[in-house]
Amino acid sequence: MSEQNWKQNLNLPQRDTRPQTEDVLNTKGKSFEDFNLKRELLMGIFEAGFEKPSPIQEESIPMALAGRDVLARAKNGTGKTASFIIPSLQQIKPKLNKIQALILVPTRELALQTSQVVRTLGKHLGIQCMVTTGGTSLKDDILRLNDPVHVLVGTPGRVLDLAARSVADLSECPLFVMDEADKMLSREFKGIIEQILEFFPKNRQSLLFSATFPLAVKSFMDKHLNKPYEINLMDELTLRGITQYYAFVEEKQKLHCLNTLFSKLQINQSIIFCNSTNRVELLAKKITELGYSCYYSHAKMPQQARNKVFHEFRQGKVRNLVCSDLLTRGIDIQAVNVVINFDFPKTAETYLHRIGRSGRFGHLGLAINLMSWNDRYSLYKIEQELGTEIKPIPATIDRKLYVADNEDAIPKPFKIEQLPKGNEKVHTRAGYEYKGQPEVQSGQQHAQQQLQPSQQPQQQLQQPQQPQAAPQGYPPAFNGYPPYQQYPPQAGGYPPPQFNGYQAAPGQQ
């Protein structure tokens, strides 16, 4: 392919023309060609829909390509994943059949997503990427490592297991990458990370990326990194494109409040967070009973079920996903424009990662927090720590705050080509039998189903949700509060914030 026309033959996706915020537009004007990348890598980058580097990519990619250790801090949804995948792919030698990059992430869903980004960007390089996580077949992973693997993406426990068995040879691996480094160096994972590093050569290169860097990261940096280049693009913690509201609601009125939000908001896709796995399952069932499409996911589900839910939600087969904090880390689904905290989080870190599931890559998003009176202390604390303002929910929410005029331009996520096979053992609390949750299949039939195109294109989700008739006796009466008809009808479904509870949705008064 000649020097002049190689770009003309690229299979480019539909251009994302939605407006973006300064979180990704405040760049120095560099292009990906300025980094002297391999042409095959540039082809993968452009065919994935990347047009120009974001600020974190401008800062980190040149330093990583120069061989420096990098400690980078940037907001959720600003392009951190490509910031370490692009230099990793540039440095890999496809003819050398050894693991040349290890990418560690805290959750299994994020491992699946990251591995697919590696495959998508590196599809013209002849690079083999393997994903390995807990909850999947160890035997299959061992067999897979008999074949060439250049990039290994996984969760810490499984990677340590494979390294300790001398199945995954990291002795000549030159590149160590940690995404969501603050979580990876928490008490939960830090000991495992220290053990994994013992299998690496001493002259390795380390790349650490996160939105927050607590003291644990500082101590790890002093011990294991070699004069790292530090990047901090966190002039403020929250994304500029996300509008945040709260509503004080009694616990028994939360479901009715959620129902009203569904009927009033123009939701493309939403993620609804709860603080416990039990509440995740119960809420998902209630939402399904109200007639809305809904899946759920939490850590106690079988891995195969989690993979299936994650894959179908990414592909736009369902509009709403109820989950625990399992999906607060790194999950990138551009179509999500609304995040609802059904249970208000206790820490600023959790809040920051939850709302960061909307407003991805400088686009618009909406975060709504349903709060009990006891949550007011957490609200004040989070506002102070993040330096942000969470406003009372207004009578009407301007759709321009969270809905782009050209929603058809939303890019489809990188399709996960094949999901790992789950363990044979099935958790007794699987919780995916009820109507609305996808059935989980196994073997070749399951793998083939993942390769079929979505039966419900993502664009179909852009119509407002239409609730079915509510169950008899729903919503419950407001104890001690004026009847619904005493609220002014012009409130448009959103009562003033001083009211505990929402006025009934149309047809339910």
From Swiss-Prot:
Gene3D superfamilies: P-loop containing nucleotide triphosphate hydrolases
Motif (DEAD box): 179-182
Residue ranges of domain Helicase C-terminal in the record: 241-401
Residue span of region Disordered: 1-27, 438-509
Family annotation (InterPro entries): DEAD/DEAH_box_helicase_dom, Helicase_ATP-bd, Helicase_C-like, P-loop_NTPase, RNA-helicase_DEAD-box_CS, RNA_helicase_DEAD_Q_motif
Keywords: ATP-binding, Cytoplasm, Helicase, Hydrolase, mRNA processing, mRNA transport, Nucleotide-binding, RNA-binding, Translation regulation, Transport
Domain Helicase ATP-binding: 61-231
Gene Ontology biological process terms, A to Z: cellular response to glucose starvation; cellular response to nitrogen starvation; deadenylation-dependent decapping of nuclear-transcribed mRNA; invasive filamentous growth; mRNA processing; mRNA transport; negative regulation of translational elongation; P-body assembly
Binding residues for ATP: 74-81
Any one Gene Ontology cellular component term annotated for this protein: cytoplasmic stress granule
Keyword RNA-binding: yes
Reaction catalysis annotation: ATP + H2O = ADP + phosphate + H(+)
E.C. code: 3.6.4.13
Protein location: Cytoplasm, P-body
Biased composition (Low complexity): 441-493
Described function: ATP-dependent RNA helicase involved in mRNA turnover, and more specifically in mRNA decapping by activating the decapping enzyme DCP1. Is involved in G1/S DNA-damage checkpoint recovery, probably through the regulation of the translational status of a subset of mRNAs. May also have a role in translation and mRNA nuclear export.
Name under which the protein is recorded: ATP-dependent RNA helicase DHH1
Organism: Scheffersomyces stipitis (strain ATCC 58785 / CBS 6054 / NBRC 10063 / NRRL Y-11545)
Underlying gene: DHH1
